[in-house]
């Protein structure tokens, strides 16, 4: 059987690269959403936004679609930036600077990354899973790898930021990796049922 086309509902190059590495062993052809395709994220949770994106891209392309919505929630900031993580400021550098400035008055630096994944076919949701990673916000950026808030998110118990880790390590302990650990058996089952 030919590979199944799966459209990644994202224009984020860092995220697309991670998805490709995480799904490397699957009989799927990973495609990216149409250039310029914009989806308004109107959900109030990461999962609602992932669902909105997966359905919209699947309906637009006629293929299965995989969407994620993920972000950083900082305890002292009442969960901010949360679902607004990518819209917190206009660049990664500015987002990091803004978050560090807002955290200055607080001693509590606990944070968690969450990744909600959704696979849809047309308007039907086929799979939904969420993964998490607990950590702390550092006082300054550390490391050169990754993207987004990776340089200021130190994983609990490891003393390393995401940006200090190589891809393999981040894949095994990170929020997206944890979500994919839950997604993969369900995706295998889905692909198996499509072959019948």
Curated annotation (Swiss-Prot):
Binds 1 Mg(2+) ion per subunit. Substrate binds at residues 10-15, 70, 147-150, 170, 175-176. One of its GO terms (biological process) is nucleotide metabolic process. Mg(2+) binds at residues 40, 69. GO terms for molecular function: dITP diphosphatase activity; ITP diphosphatase activity; metal ion binding; nucleotide binding; ribonucleoside triphosphate phosphatase activity; XTP diphosphatase activity. Pfam families: Ham1p_like. GO terms for cellular component: cytosol. Keywords: Hydrolase, Magnesium, Metal-binding, Nucleotide metabolism, Nucleotide-binding. The active site is at residue 69. Its cofactor is Mg(2+). It catalyses: XTP + H2O = XMP + diphosphate + H(+); dITP + H2O = dIMP + diphosphate + H(+); ITP + H2O = IMP + diphosphate + H(+). InterPro entries: dITP/XTP_pyrophosphatase, ITPase-like_fam, RdgB/HAM1. Its EC number is 3.6.1.66. Pyrophosphatase that catalyzes the hydrolysis of nucleoside triphosphates to their monophosphate derivatives, with a high preference for the non-canonical purine nucleotides XTP (xanthosine triphosphate), dITP (deoxyinosine triphosphate) and ITP. Seems to function as a house-cleaning enzyme that removes non-canonical purine nucleotides from the nucleotide pool, thus preventing their incorporation into DNA/RNA and avoiding chromosomal lesions. PANTHER family: INOSINE TRIPHOSPHATE PYROPHOSPHATASE, INOSINE TRIPHOSPHATE PYROPHOSPHATASE/HAM1 PROTEIN. Belongs to the HAM1 NTPase family. Homodimer. This is dITP/XTP pyrophosphatase. It comes from Prochlorococcus marinus (strain NATL2A).
């Amino acid at each position: 059987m030919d590979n199944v086309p799966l459209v990644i509902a994202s224009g984020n190059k860092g995220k697309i690269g991670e998805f490709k590495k995480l799904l490397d062993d699957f009989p799927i052809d990973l495609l990216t959403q149409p250039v310029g395709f914009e989806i308004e994220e109107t959900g109030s949770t990461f999962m609602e936004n992932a669902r909105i994106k997966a359905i919209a891209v699947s309906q637009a392309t006629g293929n299965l679609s995989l969407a994620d919505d993920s972000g950083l929630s900082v305890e002292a900031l009442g969960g901010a930036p949360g679902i607004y993580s990518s819209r917190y400021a206009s660049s990664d550098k500015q987002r990091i600077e803004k978050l560090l400035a807002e955290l200055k008055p607080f001693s509590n630096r606990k944070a968690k990354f969450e990744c909600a994944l959704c696979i849809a076919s047309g308007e039907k949701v086929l799979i939904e899973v969420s993964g998490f990673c607990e950590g702390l916000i550092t006082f300054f950026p550390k490391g050169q790898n990754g993207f987004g808030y990776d340089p200021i998110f130190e994983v609990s118990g490891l003393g390393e930021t995401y940006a200090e880790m190589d891809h393999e390590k981040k894949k095994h302990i990170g929020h997206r990796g944890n979500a994919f650990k839950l997604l993969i058996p369900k995706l295998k089952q889905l692909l198996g049922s499509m072959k019948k």
